[in-house]
Amino acid sequence: MKNWWLLFIVFVSCSKNAQVYAPVGGLSEEEMGVSKNRAKQLNTMEREQIQEWISKQKEKFYPTQLNYWSNIENLEQRKKKQDGEQVSFQYELYDFDLQKFYEKPKIYKNAPLGKFEELDAIEDAVRYLNPDEETTLLVPSVLAYGTYGDGDQIPYDMPLIIKLKLIK
């Protein structure tokens, strides 16, 4: 019986609490909090800048539930296309000085809704557009390419103007 207790004590005393590390390349809890706070402040600042930009335009823009603006009033009250429906559309990206990022529009043919690898604001707006209808979207960077940019011409933390057209 003494041997069992002795063995038990040896095993228990040898086991150490495993240290918990943040994932390689990951952020600690404190860093996550700082990052979250930065994103929140950036989003608030960009929303204010976009609203100021809107106030200087002749065209009206309307906020959406997804946190972007469209020049179509009551866009989200229209009939919504469902996941799986195929749509064809094109869009062009601009900064708020109306400088175009790419010469040619990005064109997608027969893209199934719900499986987009595009910006969330584009997929959301496409769901409500009618064939051959166009809209202009004002999108904060958090809904655009965020803190990384697109890896090509769009820098990080860049709010975008998106001119979107549903082809069919």
What are the roles of these predicted feature ranges?
Residues 14-168:
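Cross-family detector of peptidyl-prolyl cis-trans isomerase
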Residues 1-14:
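Sec-dependent bacterial lipoprotein signal peptides
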